[in-house]
Amino acid sequence: MCGIVGIAGVMPVNQSIYDALTVLQHRGQDAAGIITIDANNCFRLRKANGLVSDVFEARHMQRLQGNMGIGHVRYPTAGSSSASEAQPFYVNSPYGITLAHNGNLTNAHELRKKLFEEKRRHINTTSDSEILLNIFASELDNFRHYPLEADNIFAAIAATNRLIRGAYACVAMIIGHGMVAFRDPNGIRPLVLGKRDIDENRTEYMVASESVALDTLGFDFLRDVAPGEAIYITEEGQLFTRQCADNPVSNPCLFEYVYFARPDSFIDKISVYSARVNMGTKLGEKIAREWEDLDIDVVIPIPETSCDIALEIARILGKPYRQGFVKNRYVGRTFIMPGQQLRRKSVRRKLNANRAEFRDKNVLLVDDSIVRGTTSEQIIEMAREAGAKKVYLASAAPEIRFPNVYGIDMPSATELIAHGREVDEIRQIIGADGLIFQDLNDLIDAVRAENPDIQQFECSVFNGVYVTKDVDQGYLDFLDTLRNDDAKAVQRQNEVENLEMHNEG
């Protein structure tokens, strides 16, 4: 999962992009990058592994000159976690193009082969984002005149959409032209558009993964970029938009609302906060029906995503809500941390139990989801160590039984605790006295209540239905060989830093 931002401004954008990336940091903590276009029409790039605050020092910010730029925060879902695979990526032909991408291409392997054999384009990393950039560049290269018209750029994006499959929200810059952004025909990954009027004659535009980035910088939210839609903002600040997909349909990722997005964001006209409150209502009602005989003394969230959900469950059940865990905010999210051993070590550094809320009580813990089960098992153990008599666990999401192929790092089915297991078996493994999951239909209803115009969601991790209709068991097996924890351990041992000559080190 990644976060992207792009600003076409009339004033220097380096600080604004930095600030936007800090509020999108929850979408990826592995690497960060910013690239701008300076007054000489040259790219200025800084990218490296680490948090936004670690990657960009004052000397880097001073070099990132220009009124137009894009930024990216990354967690690696395709390729390795080497600094050379941090984004944005760059190609020098045609014109000079740079691109940042959130998502995952499901036909990256065949596209890499096509680019080399047919287009003579070499891909130097294992990142599908570099492949996507080169596909787009190759399509732009079909137009031999300069400068390109908006029609030409939209035609290149339409051709790109026909070639690539999967999930993608992208922002790019083309030297001598401006900034472009586009979203996949299923709208799986989020992308929003905003503007800020500087004065009567000057307007700045911004695209980002979540609306909270617009809010932070004082941009007015215009709308979500539609599935299959492309945005083009010229160097002069003129805005063009066009539908560039043949059969666009809205299939936003349901897991965005459960886990990834910030609660103060709106995605596809849905308040993430309100959706989570609705999840709490649905799950609370199910608990009241199915666990009416349980003696629950207190409802405690596993912070932070589940806090709003747990508060609503407590209201439905008529039980006290307490903050039983204190969170160290300087430790990354555990299920998107590379490697199972790192995740296990991280949980106890991340959370500490407040014994006063657990001692001699039957506690209902609430989490947003259960992925590998690593966190759940250790937190239940911590609750017992803190003196809880019984520990029940409620998940705001249904059982995650299938790999994700659209940009979330949980692809290996064998690493999912719910894969091939029933609820009671999962309960025994994690050591809970009781375990309950949200029903998928209830989860969909909870989110869709905020925008009834959305007819369906991308729910593959719950039901195994992949909306791009190109994912088979062979592809899932291929991903497993690349992305399971053992494979990633080998990748980390073999990685060699390659910062690239144009990187502002």
UniProtKB/Swiss-Prot annotation:
Key words, A-Z: Glutamine amidotransferase, Glycosyltransferase, Magnesium, Metal-binding, Purine biosynthesis, Transferase
SUPFAM superfamilies per record: N-terminal nucleophile aminohydrolases (Ntn hydrolases), PRTase-like
CDD domains to which the protein is assigned, alphabetical: GPATase_N, PRTases_typeI
Domain Glutamine amidotransferase type-2: 2-236
Pfam families cross-referenced by the UniProt entry: GATase_6, Pribosyltran
EC number: 2.4.2.14
Pathway(s): Purine metabolism; IMP biosynthesis via de novo pathway; N(1)-(5-phospho-D-ribosyl)glycinamide from 5-phospho-alpha-D-ribose 1-diphosphate: step 1/2
Keyword Repeat: no
Record-listed Mg(2+) binding positions: 305, 367-368
Functional summary from the UniProt entry: Catalyzes the formation of phosphoribosylamine from phosphoribosylpyrophosphate (PRPP) and glutamine. Can also use NH(3) in place of glutamine.
PANTHER family tied to this protein: AMIDOPHOSPHORIBOSYLTRANSFERASE (PTHR11907)
Database matches in HAMAP family: PurF
Protein name as catalogued: Amidophosphoribosyltransferase
Organism, as annotated: Escherichia coli (strain K12)
Gene that specifies this protein: purF
